[in-house]
Amino acid sequence: MEEKRSTNSPGFDKPKLNRSGSITSATSHPPRSNSNPKLVAKHQQQLYEESKNKRNQEQQNQQPQQQQQKQTSNQSEDPATQLSSLKFESDKEKEQALLWAFLASYLPEDKGSLQKEFVKHVEYTLAQTKSECTDFSSFQALSYCTRDRLIERWKDTKLFFKQKNVKQVNYMSLEFLLGRSLQNSLSALGLVGKYSDALMDLGFKLEDLYDEERDAGLGNGGLGRLAACFMDSLATCNFPGYGYGLRYKFGMFYQTLVDGEQVELPDYWLNYGSPWEIERLDVSYPINFYGKVSEVEDENGKKVMKWDQGEQMLAVAYDYPIPGFKTYNTVAIRLWSSKPSDEFNLDSFNRGDYLGAIEEKEKSENITNVLYPNDNTMQGKELRLKQQYLFVSATIQDIISQFKETGKPFSEFHNFHAIQLNDTHPTLGIPELMRILIDEEKKSWDEAWDITTKTFSYTNHTVLPEALEKWSVSMVENVLPRHIMIIYEINERFLKLVDQKWPGDMSKRRALSIIDESDGKFIRMAFLAIVGSHTINGVAYLHSELVKHDVFPLFYEIWPNKFQNKTNGVTPRRWIQQSNPQLAELITRSLNSDRWLVNLDIIKDLVHLADNSSFQKEWMEIKRNNKIRLAKYIEKRCDIQVNVDVLFDVQVKRFHEYKRQLLNVLSVINRYLDIKEGKKVAPRVVIFGGKAAPGYYMAKLIIKLINSVADVVNNDPKVGDLLKVVFIPNYCVSNAEIIIPASDISQHISTAGTEASGTSNMKFSMNGGLIIGTLDGANIEIRDAIGHENMYIFGARSEEVNKVKKIIHDGKFTPDTRWARVLTAIKEDTFGPHEQFQDIINSVSGGNDHYILSYDFGSYLDIQNSIDQDFKDRAKWAKKSIMASVCCGKFSSDRTIKEYAQQIWGIEEWKRPGPVPVSNEEARSLLVPPPSGSPNDINAISIERLSPLTFVKQTSASPLSVISGGDKTNNTLKPKQTTKGFNIGGQPGNPTN
């Protein structure tokens, strides 16, 4: 076989095949074989001379090129070679400079680079071949690619905040209901289109990979989803902050239905790992339990308290980066996982007690296994207490560790850190900070208390007395002996203040004491949070008023300035842009801008289109498309077919008696009875979803009733499409993104004065789903924003509820006749043996109707009839739907976070400049090795990661001043100004929008 010659060798043209398959020269052709031999020889000589001359000419042409390449090669010396010409004070300084040089470049975003990174993660991170690569492994690879970019931004954000000595908020929450992260992260990074195109060439559809992700099992209900929205807004609004929580191995539980009853299964969300988390084995803290406290003398002869712990374990950090939208700022949630302090008890093992050694390890890890362990037993209660303490202790230790890096005295702690308690679960953080300041940092009580009360603030989320958390004094004394002493001291000093205000008033003293002694001894955690915090806030206007005047009125008398309102909000990036992309596109097109995603108030500019028939038509087409998507999901999950042209009526939320899912299902029974009697009704699909706490018997019984009603209704041939009842199991963020955009009506029907705020009402309204509800929580403010005519309000008002309860209890109230009919249907075994539902019947009969369902039932059915009539008028309904959406700008979590930042935390917006585009030539002058390409290729480099050591030595100027063009020195290595509009100065108060 003829040897293949290099096509790049001088003097040779690229060969090509002739028709017969033989190789010929690309320049000329020899004569045919029957030609004159002399002519052939002459021709060969001619070819030789041509080839020789051409080779000589190419060699001459290449000499300048080789010289240029040599010069370029000298310019592109690796950083180590370049650094050798600079003077350093030590080898360590030089090594640091070299490390910084390699860290400065950002990952490129061109199509080829995206594909290369994706394939690299498939091959090296997942160790898979092409034949092994499934949609799930492709999701993992893409997630790792995305995480790489989040880490770049997060590292630089941390460096930027550190350089600026900013104050940050530390948001402590036992729940972060994040949902899926891939789509949200790509959208925030602006890479959806680029990755969609890059993956299409590789045979993958981006939307299919989204569906491979499992929801993170880090929360349960509204509390956790609010925390997730807040983290999104912290990053988007450029506020310095950290979220702190726990890394649950099994989440709360995976809900399934067996014979209509809720069955809890472990939520194995971490079975295949999480591509988003960053395990921080370098960040761990010892956590201590039990033991005893004794008074000893320190080295100075001072009496101090010493806690000899009986059990120790470790809290190990896992970080989840949270990107901001249309900003380079990225924050993180730090989650703690419990580990044994020694991985294995070798002593026990060597004594032959292998099972004991294993048991000790598992006992440590159990603490963060499950969200909210069932506390119906003493063991469950103790596990929950240990879980909360591990959470707060690790968090406080971590915050203090960060603060010590500033080198500032502890008197300035509150100038660098604010701590927000999301409900009472993290309240043990108050005595924990006191313990560390007094016992470890040797501060006096007054110094420690001053620092603590300037640092903490507390958000209350409930007005229900039974929901206000309490801990048994004896249990805390056993598990946390040092902390019970501190809590007693806090209480004693606080009660002196009470005595000063109300001398000799023992009833006030008992009512305000942190220690409740009315029935045993319990620590009232909300009281501890109020006493130890500088600010207390409710989460809706009505709720905050109830907190001040009904729930904590005496505290409000003492500290009226401590109490504020911060109405909740939700992020429009997830709850419109991600969950309802067609609606987002319509809004953007109609506004000719997508700025509404970071300034939701401007969608009100669309109010004038509410009467526009073509806009209404497009709006309702989008709604119908979302209903089609939900109908497919229902058929797949529940095996029920529904008509998308009828009204979709939705109630999805955590199950609790005060939320009154029971009122809803009783109205469904009434509608079913109307159909059976031949009355004309508007067709409707009624959709339920939500979990009941494992130990909440009544909530689980209501779920059973709903499914029993659904079983009868959906299988009755006389009913057909007039009524369908659907219970969607395992309600979570990802299926909420399908359910919420499809609703025509959503139900928020809690007894007035019991719901703190609610956030699902905001999500439904933003997506054009009309609300039927009581004047409770945020419903009131939504009504004020969108107009009473665009909501369906019924029921007693909060100020009437106590009077209503009394007349029901006294037997002086006669319910609507339809109420008796519905209860009779249950008693007559219409939906199965009535005995199984007897406790439900008892809970709303005989003066026991605590949540006044019987009182509100009549007005509830009447407003449902109004909905049926309005839904028939398509233009009227479309206008209501549009108004419900475009007037909801107030309910963005961005607004809420800005209010917290300005009025509670005292933090400022710090928008980091982001990477700066520079050419390869400029990158070399900054001692940054460019990835590849010609001197004029553009790369993105990090200002924060440019070495302050090498750059100052190289240019006698700071990286910031040179890149921003601020350096006026005559330095030949100064790159051109290539900031392209980025805010290099990084001053506070530069909002994204």
UniProtKB/Swiss-Prot annotation:
Query: At the top level of its lineage, which domain of life is listed?
Result: Eukaryota
Question: What does the record give as the reaction this protein catalyses?
Answer: [(1->4)-alpha-D-glucosyl](n) + phosphate = [(1->4)-alpha-D-glucosyl](n-1) + alpha-D-glucose 1-phosphate
Q: Tell me, which GO biological process terms does this entry list? A: glycogen catabolic process; response to ammonium ion; response to cAMP; response to differentiation-inducing factor 1
Q: Which GO terms describe its cellular component?
A: cytoplasm
PROSITE patterns (alphabetical): PHOSPHORYLASE (PS00102)
Post-translationally, this protein is described as follows, namely: The N-terminus is blocked.
Q: What is its EC number?
A: 2.4.1.1
Q: How does it assemble?
A: Homodimer.
Print the miscellaneous field: In D.discoideum glycogen phosphorylase exists as 2 developmentally regulated forms, GP1 and GP2, which are the products of separate genes.
State the name under which the record lists this protein: Glycogen phosphorylase 2
Q: Which organism is it from?
A: Dictyostelium discoideum
Q: Lineage in the entry?
A: Eukaryota, Amoebozoa, Evosea, Eumycetozoa, Dictyostelia
Gene from which this protein is expressed: glpD
